[in-house]
Amino acid sequence: MASQLIENKLKLLPEKAGCYLMKDVNGKVIYVGKSKNLKNRVRSYFKSSQEGRRAELVKNIADYDIIVVDSDKEAFLLEVTLIKKYQPYYNVALKSGTGYPYIEITNEKNPQTRLTSIVYKDKGYYFGPYPNVYAASATLKFIQKVFPLRRCSGYTGRPCLYYHMGQCLGSCFKEVPQSEYDEQIKKIKRFLNGDIQEVKKDLTNKMLQASADLEFERAGELRDQLKYIEETVEKQKIISNDHTQRDIFNYYVDRSWISIQVFFLRQAKLLRRESHMFPLTDETDPEDEFMSFIAQFYAQKNRVNPREVLVPKGIDQDELAAAIGIKVRTPQRGQKASLMEMARENAQLKLDDKFRLLELGQRKTKGAQEEIFKALGLPYGSYIESFDHSHIQGADPVSALVVFKDGEPFKTGYRKFKLKGEVEHQNSADEVGNTREVVRRRYSRLLKEHERMPDLILMDGGQIQVEACEDVLRNELNLDIPVAGMVKDDKHRTNHLLYGDPFKGQPFKLIPMDPKSEGFYLMTRIQDEVHRFAITFHRQTHAKNSLVSRLDSIKGIGPKSRTKLLREFGSLKKIKEASIDDLRKAGLTLTQAQAVKISL
């Protein structure tokens, strides 16, 4: 339900185009949206029930601001600017940079070709990004051999090794004419833009000439260069009749999620693709979310823009082009229209796969938990809590609690308990005392703090532990929480649940669990997890108590000195390794430090 502040502001909303900025309790902008009609759009967040990501957003809105503009186009441009400025949590967040290498022709007096992952606005030429760093490296090496520029660090007064190898124009020892660089750069650009026939023809002629001149080593090098073109460049499928650099975007929406595919066309080939999926914050206008995504995509640092962006029907091309500064088109037929449909099919496939994986995962998590509740004859509940105790012949008794939410560990809910009761040896009475104490402490605190109670408690044990737990819940705390025991057979394998409610006249009975069922696997997982957690905590507690006991036995070491040692060193091993000076720095006197060294 909206706060009174928001209710009052909703009455003042204009029926105009503009942007709205949703804010949290700290005044931080958490979502930016735009609309042709601010009144209808903003009111829709608070005047109807919400689901999924939008429900989560609304829950966190404490206030909002609006900015009115003259048109929907202006609203879109402003939205792009605001998202870039505030980076709101509930808007699409894209990683900066592509993570892929580019081939750069540097903008220098003596230019060179190199690999880079950062694109600077320095008037250099950038080609890429390349999906594979090895492919990019191989292409660069080919260019440096066939179209040499500068490969050395600059003028040294003598020719470099690369000059002798024919891979440097010689700026290391002479003035290279700009026209010579321009000619080579022109060839490199043609090659990287897909025009390879001229290069093949030139290399073939040079190879034949080298053979005729009996320069067989040189002819072999040229043959290898031709082979590189045939095996790598020509093998890539040509999918366009021209060499215009294009990015193709399409999307698919299902179950309040949007899946977006980006195809990168470079050198007349499909160079690579990117997939993005995220929940829709505003389900009413997926086209707006799609356009906002593209605007953010090109707002990233180091992004090299294509000459043209292709989008599906229904997207305002002029509005998007104004936002990203790139020509935007919707193909109607031919290869590009086929690629657009391919992008949509891939977007759908990705989203369908995601939902299938989620469904499979739910069968092993939430579905498994449903099986446990169904076996007990209980309505489904999200939270299961489980206890286990650990001690060594009654020494250092502890209990541990684990929480499972919808079939998965909810680790922020885990708790540890140092038991306060005196335990002399392990028997049924001790288990009862341990259970009663930890259940009392856990749920009296939840009552006091008005926290959520679990839907089911699973005890690692049989009827003794279950009855002790139920007694405290019903008779002391007046709580009605179902309690079941995870019972082991004579081979110490858990295969049954023990459940009953004597307070409601239901006798205890063993409920078998199918060993092949997901519910059985979840039950054993809960039991293993609570046992692991209890054992680990007990080992830590026992080690610490043993250390305290050893220190207490040293003459002259009282509680204050012991605390100083524990705070400074933390373990018996480190105290043993410490020098007299180290012990004195921890706050001990010379006599105390000597006593510690002698005793340990």
UniProtKB/Swiss-Prot annotation:
- An example molecular function term from Gene Ontology annotations: DNA binding
Describe the location of the UVR domain by residue ranges.
Answer: 197-232
List localization entries: Cytoplasm
The record, for PROSITE patterns, names: GIY_YIG, UVR, UVRC
Q: Which GO terms describe its cellular component?
A: cytoplasm; excinuclease repair complex
Domain GIY-YIG residue range list: 15-92
What's a GO biological-process term for it? nucleotide-excision repair
Keyword annotations for this protein? Cytoplasm, DNA damage, DNA excision, DNA repair, Excision nuclease, SOS response
> Where is the major localization of this protein?
cytoplasm
UniProt lists the family membership as follows:
Belongs to the UvrC family.
Q: How does it assemble?
A: Interacts with UvrB in an incision complex.
What is this protein for, i.e. what is its function?
The UvrABC repair system catalyzes the recognition and processing of DNA lesions. UvrC both incises the 5' and 3' sides of the lesion. The N-terminal half is responsible for the 3' incision and the C-terminal half is responsible for the 5' incision.
> By what name is this protein known?
UvrABC system protein C
Give the species. Answer: Lactobacillus delbrueckii subsp. bulgaricus (strain ATCC 11842 / DSM 20081 / BCRC 10696 / JCM 1002 / NBRC 13953 / NCIMB 11778 / NCTC 12712 / WDCM 00102 / Lb 14)
Q: What is the lineage of its organism?
A: Bacteria, Bacillati, Bacillota, Bacilli, Lactobacillales
